[in-house]
Amino acid sequence: MRSSFLVSNPPFLPSLIPRYSSRKSIRRSRERFSFPESLRVSLLHGIRRNIEVAQGVQFDGPIMDRDVNLDDDLVVQVCVTRTLPPALTLELGLESLKEAIDELKTNPPKSSSGVLRFQVAVPPRAKALFWFCSQPTTSDVFPVFFLSKDTVEPSYKSLYVKEPHGVFGIGNAFAFVHSSSVDSNGHSMIKTFLSDESAMVTAYGFPDIEFNKYSTVNSKDGSSYFFVPQIELDEHEEVSILAVTLAWNESLSYTVEQTISSYEKSIFQVSSHFCPNVEDHWFKHLKSSLAKLSVEEIHPLEMEHMGFFTFSGRDQADVKELKSIQSSCQFHCKLSPDVVFSNNMLNRETEVSNFLRDEANINAVWASAIIEECTRLGLTYFCVAPGSRSSHLAIAAANHPLTTCLACFDERSLAFHAIGYAKGSLKPAVIITSSGTAVSNLLPAVVEASEDFLPLLLLTADRPPELQGVGANQAINQINHFGSFVRFFFNLPPPTDLIPVRMVLTTVDSALHWATGSACGPVHLNCPFRDPLDGSPTNWSSNCLNGLDMWMSNAEPFTKYFQVQSHKSDGVTTGQITEILQVIKEAKKGLLLIGAIHTEDEIWASLLLAKELMWPVVADVLSGVRLRKLFKPFVEKLTHVFVDHLDHALFSDSVRNLIEFDVVIQVGSRITSKRVSQMLEKCFPFAYILVDKHPCRHDPSHLVTHRVQSNIVQFANCVLKSRFPWRRSKLHGHLQALDGAIAREMSFQISAESSLTEPYVAHMLSKALTSKSALFIGNSMPIRDVDMYGCSSENSSHVVDMMLSAELPCQWIQVTGNRGASGIDGLLSSATGFAVGCKKRVVCVVGDISFLHDTNGLAILKQRIARKPMTILVINNRGGGIFRLLPIAKKTEPSVLNQYFYTAHDISIENLCLAHGVRYVHVGTKSELEDALFVPSVEEMDCIVEVESSINANAIVHSTLERFARQAAENSLGIVSASSFLHPMIKNVLLCQVSGIQYSQYRVKLCDRPTICSDEFSQFHREGFILSLTLEDGSIGYGEVAPLNSNVENLMDVEGQLQLVLHLMNEAKFSYMLPLLNGSISSWIWSELGITASSIFPSVRCGLEMALLNAMAVRHDSSLLGILHYQKEENGSAQPHSVQICALLDSEGTPLEVAYVARKLVQEGFSAIKLKVGRRVSSVQDALVMQEVRRAVGVQIELRADANCRWTFEEAREFGLLVNSCNLKYIEEPVQNKDDLIRFHEETGLPVALDETLDDFEECPLRMLTKYTHPGIVAVVIKPSVVGGFENAALIARWAQQHGKMAVISAAYESGLGLSAYILFASYLEMENVKASTEQKQGTPPSVAHGLGTYRWLSEDVMMNTLGIFRSPYSGFVEGFIADASRNLKDVKINNDVIVRTSKGIPVRRYELRVDVDGFSHFIRVHDVGENAEGSVALFLHGFLGTGEEWIPIMTGISGSARCISVDIPGHGRSRVQSHASETQTSPTFSMEMIAEALYKLIEQITPGKVTIVGYSMGARIALYMALRFSNKIEGAVVVSGSPGLKDPVARKIRSATDDSKARMMVDNGLYIFIENWYNGGLWKSLRNHPHFSKIAASRLLHGDVPSVAKLLSDLSSGRQPSLWEELEDCDTNISLVFGEKDVKYKQIATRMYREMSKSKKSVNNIIEIVEIPEAGHAVHLESPLRVILALRKFLTRVHNSSTETELSQKLLLALKEM
């Protein structure tokens, strides 16, 4: 017997296993599970060497007992994980891992123990099962196993039907043993655990067994055997992970050399038994491979596996503990040559020889042989059409244990179903039909399969030869019935025992070889039968079975086909491929065109090809990457330029004339877009390289110059090995700019339309898809709409982290359709087949005519065989809507179109569904569609979703979108062309760079109290800031920041944000495309500044946008209007010279007094007046004023009212009824409740305008505005400084204009600078509206009087320039003149008399302070920002690996409230230490006590008073400790993502041991590898999504003394610091607990801390608050600095006020005592 391991005792596993011997399985009752999204382990155990069976390290475990002896020595080993670049194939992934290990051998680890994991992403369907089955039965390496992830009734048959994802593993990296904490002599022992918080390490094993050193297995309660494989392939939906794990421990006599030697045995075996050339058709070999598993399966036994999980349910919140282990009940595991466990993996059916010899007659023998050979070839899915002639084939298929049969009465639908199955499974389905026209009905599907290269096996029954041509029933000529559309035809003779059955088998084998060859396609076997209905026994000679003994003794096909290839063929680049590679290398303007792709391996390869070439990528909707899911950090990256909207861009003549390529590579099949094809024709000649695996000609335009017959994987391999230099052309930047502009425009137009449109369906459909779903698109309009209006979207899948580190920026979505012949027949049936084949949840979208063309497909849908539920969208526009978009529609009579093209109908789809028993849902609105797509059905059932549409409305929508796409393309191209001509591009990207920025605070006098102020307001002045932005060429742009001092923002908070903006904008770069607005500025703010646009105060964003746009205008020698409204010179349309101004009237006084003022305004030249209402005792009084004003000004003057949400509904209704005769243009916000706005209009008839309602939206107002499309809402009043700048204002205005509403720009008492910008912006909106109306032939819209009359309140101005608002000599009305406004903004002259102060940013003073602690001098790096007259000081402490630098942006933001100081905590950054102690103590102990003492002494040097201490993570623990222990010096503490430490002794011991191990890992492997592993943890998921994550991670490398950083990690471990939980309720310091919304762990900790602190306060004035920062994770201050600044400023103010009150109280009390 061989020796083996003693293994662990997981306390959470049942121990009910009886004794058993090897090769026997045990029945255990366990609840079935669903696999988690990720498999992770927290604490594992054991180290011990096995000499013969499975060498490896052993750890204690797999989990520490609750009553562990705390006197034990504890060691925790950290796994170091290295992620390699993604591999093109599984084989190349192995090579990548080999190279990594070879490098490790040349530079072996210096540590005496360790665990290393190398992992690489490989294509998702890497075939773990086949790789496992390829291993030799006499394996030299153990354990070796396969574990299925199938959780729904797994069985041997399900391996064929479902092809489940699974795990293959081999070798033993380490295993786990359970051991007592004392030895036999009672001495304490060293316990060793494995702890990993980031790697995807998984342990596998069995509970309640003892696998001993003699390689025997016994049942033993409390024992278990778990191991981590040395080599592992783990398959997921999105990606597969191939990994190698190595472990060593020299103290247990297992060295690095030994573990590498063991690995080499494992890698040699798996590499030697790996057949890449059969990967494409591995299903042919599955049955024979599974047959090799010769172990007898007696009873089911579940194989346990466990993963890493975070546990926080005990007293402490950061202890990790294993949860209950998930289990699988389909597996095969060889622990040794003699110990094998298996369940649901083996076939226990009767041998083939028996059932063939037992057949009743020769017909049954041949039929059974055909079906058996099909199953051996991997064909297990049979589509059976009922019929007498095919009865023997149907019965044989139905009775075979491995087949899945589907029956349908309609052969046509059945055949299309088989096509769909081939698309999804990549293997043929078998179609069985009777004779006659049943065969003919297959022709449409055969044509589609032939044209789309889909494998299909047709078994058509037939009459025997003697009944042919003699008028026999159902006898037609079936010889070569499908002509050239099949790859192979053979007419079998009628069954007879005179012909060896071998002939039948070789014919089937040959047919499948043709079906799956390089030109895949349908094959046809015609099968004549005599007496097909006679099942009675007849004598037949078994001699026909001669020669089948070997075949009947195994599970392999009779004839196996092999293609001999050189093992070096992929790496050789000779002959023609060398010529092609040279063409690619010399390309200057390359384009990668990705056509239709069926396989995930090829989609994966196309992504890696795009990543290597770095060319612009145009992806067809059927490519799988057109509707990709983007990982958030890559949304703004330039690495992959997918030009998704090239089809839209080509509507523009300018774009068509611009584009030219010198090399185009097309991988995949046909492309959908006709305009892209036309573009290629126009660009020709160029080198056109077409790559496809079939040899057929696919070149309708006759452009292909280089035809490569190869699959995409092979071609990509050649390209990837060549390593081409990257060239980024100017065209590359142009296409990127075009695509971004059009994408934003299409998104806006589709979303802004209130009704449900067909483009909206395509747009939302793409967002609803996930990696676990797939899309089947119907022909005609659906595929064109999805190709044009589908979009990529962000993804948050669990594999994101892996694919990010693997440098793959996106995840694909499997998409298919019937594009071989592009017919509309059989689509529903094809979609159901696709769902069966791909094993995913399929969404299908078809038109109504396509649906009606295949209603028999509902019968197949109803059967729901072997697939997941489907959602089928039927776009019902009552006919063939595509013809309405064709030129013929303009020249043909409507009656002819309706009858012969549209084929209009009134068929009820609902009734059809009802008749077939299929669930039906009707949607007519956007929200209903979203519910149907996004809200999961409680019932797991299929659903037909009918989307109501109309042909004419759809045509109008498409025409409108085409027009706006063309405009967006023209505008963006105009900006790009002008910019690139005037200024050189930075690395071929159009960017400006900021060279300087400053702001000045102003204070101007007003001549009256603003109408926004209360009656108590008596100071007539306006305060704000002027932002000045200088570009690298000296161009200067000005912007105004004018907060209204509301509850949203005030002057002090705004200045804090401005200071941060100044810091972030230093040398920032921005694109010339910002003037396109429509999301471009928001994207830039996030990608360049690293802050979300929604976190910026509206007035700050408005001023920033104003400055940016004005600077760009100056740079281009243009104006704000000129860059917003790009217009070609040859266009010739004159720009407006002015915009009308609406006067503002505060309705104080009697009705006659107000009317008098109104009359004076009319005399001054105002054509419109807005009255403020809602200020009086009752609305009746306001109505009387309005009536009097109307009488005074006459009917020609436009009157508006503004109630500012002051009235109840009843009050507003009363006003509305009284002023109905006053002909008001509108009233703004008449009611307090926004839900009453439409009701108010309906009951009063008074038009309503939105104003304050617009203030409530955040980043996307369109969804909110959808509620206000009612015609009674006639206008939107937009204050740019309130809604957040020009981009948001333009978005709202465009929505309003699109829905026929007025867009009125309104000022908020800005200075002349802001008013000048608003004049130009209002003019831009007017011009856009005129342009849109003209193109829609709606006539010229009336001019709008904009709400800029607040200029009359200005007693003085910020600018010395004359404000260009005066009475026009031409119109006689008061207007804002564009020329004056443009001139003012181009040459701004600041009135220094109103400037209070100017700031170019807060300077940072950097210096060192020395503090002496415990015989060491610590020279602490200090960053000092700001001065505060009142003496407030805030000390900022960074987290582990950080430095004081990371706090500087926030410190600048709150420097106006306090002097801000950050430090490099001892051991970090540039802080250093010098020893004055004995030589034996060369480094200090960085304990909590030592750090706190050092900082305390530092504070004493900084200030004699108290400080508020702000700490993040590790710094937060220090801050809390100091707040509790040094309250005499600390007046407040802000604990950001921090904790009080650990209370549980076991948790403390584990955590300190874990941190010790991490410290050793840092010293042994270096800081770079440590940081790579550190930030792979789940705690940092949100931070990894930040656009500046790479920069943040790089900043963590800037530490001068890495050993000190490592020592601090150990010494300051939360397991060693004093637990502060017991002290919280005695805290007498002001505390603010801050955490991120996404940081679940620290949110729970903060909540618990808050409860503890709130129990008892020592002072009634103490502040205890809890603050949640939206849209942020653990690193709150880095992810959302503006919101942190706001929270800190408020807390510091409260602390200061509280301290002041306390001092006053103490003085008062002292005075009273003295009295």
From Swiss-Prot:
GO terms for molecular function: 2-succinyl-5-enolpyruvyl-6-hydroxy-3-cyclohexene-1-carboxylic-acid synthase activity; 2-succinyl-6-hydroxy-2,4-cyclohexadiene-1-carboxylate synthase activity; metal ion binding; O-succinylbenzoate synthase activity; thiamine pyrophosphate binding. Keywords: Chloroplast, Lyase, Magnesium, Manganese, Membrane, Metal-binding, Multifunctional enzyme, Plastid, Thiamine pyrophosphate, Transferase, Transit peptide, Transmembrane, Transmembrane helix. The keyword Plastid applies. Residues 20-273 are annotated as: Inactive isochorismate synthase. Residues 981-1364 are annotated as: O-succinylbenzoate synthase. GO terms for cellular component: chloroplast membrane. It is found in: Plastid, Chloroplast membrane. Its main location: plastid. GO terms for biological process: amino acid catabolic process; menaquinone biosynthetic process; photosystem I stabilization; phylloquinone biosynthetic process. It is a single-pass membrane protein. InterPro entries: AB_hydrolase_1, AB_hydrolase_fold, DHS-like_NAD/FAD-binding_dom, Enolase-like_C_sf, Enolase-like_N, Enolase_C-like, Mandel_Rmase/mucon_lact_enz_CS, Mandelate_racemase_C. Residues 363-933 are annotated as: 2-succinyl-5-enolpyruvyl-6-hydroxy-3-cyclohexene-1-carboxylate synthase. It catalyses: isochorismate + 2-oxoglutarate + H(+) = 5-enolpyruvoyl-6-hydroxy-2-succinyl-cyclohex-3-ene-1-carboxylate + CO2; (1R,6R)-6-hydroxy-2-succinyl-cyclohexa-2,4-diene-1-carboxylate = 2-succinylbenzoate + H2O; 5-enolpyruvoyl-6-hydroxy-2-succinyl-cyclohex-3-ene-1-carboxylate = (1R,6R)-6-hydroxy-2-succinyl-cyclohexa-2,4-diene-1-carboxylate + pyruvate. Mg(2+) binds at residues 1202, 1228, 1251. Disruption phenotype: High chlorophyll fluorescence and lack of phylloquinone. Residues 1435-1540 form the AB hydrolase-1 domain. Multifunctional enzyme required for phylloquinone (vitamin K1) biosynthesis. PANTHER family: 2-SUCCINYL-5-ENOLPYRUVYL-6-HYDROXY-3-CYCLOHEXENE-1-CARBOXYLATE SYNTHASE (PTHR42916), PROTEIN PHYLLO, CHLOROPLASTIC (PTHR42916:SF1). In the N-terminal section; belongs to the isochorismate synthase family. In the 2nd section; belongs to the TPP enzyme family. MenD subfamily. This is Protein PHYLLO, chloroplastic.
